[in-house]
Amino acid sequence: MGRGDVLRSGEAQVIGNMIPVIVYDKNQCDPKKCTAKRMLKFGLAKEAKTLHNIPSGSIVLSPFAERALSPADSKFGRNGVVVMDLTWTNIDEFPRLSKTQDRALPYLLASNPINWGRPMELNSAEAVLASLIILGEKEQAEGFMGRFNWAPEFIRLNGELLEAYASAKDSSEVVRIQNEYIDSIKS
């Protein structure tokens, strides 16, 4: 998986035990700040040029999903984790796909310079990093640490929650952990 690698229709490449990371880029952000483009540049992801190129059965990270990502989804992770790179201001343009497993990330804080400290406004690389940890692929997630200078701060801000989410048995337990955490910070 090098720079410029592009997925063909329905293809997902698993290297060893690694989860394929797939980017669908709507080219809406500043290319110099775009974490999706950096993931592609550093060989951390492959690009799906069209929605048709997104592998069937893959996990699509979606803010509109009805289920939270959990370790139980690791079976779908083998088909890939897909991040749709578009700006939060254009979130209504988020595509709805069939034949994929839409999952929402649980409560996490952004650590990137644009949205630092904002809950649930992660950039594409933060979303993938969190997904890999929740799905039990810590070693693969470590590959992101040296490529994004905010990554250690992301782990500092969210480490305990990520560990709790990664130890949950299913989506409902992830949601319970999330809700307990949110209740604890409200009081």
PLM region descriptions:
Residues 32-38, 43-123, 127, 134-163, ...:
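Active-site cofactor/cluster-binding pocket
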Residues 1-46:
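Short, extreme N-terminal leader segments that mark the start of a protein/domain
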Residues 160-187:
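Long, charged alpha-helical interface segments
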Residues 6, 14, 19-23, 60, ...:
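Extended aliphatic helical segments
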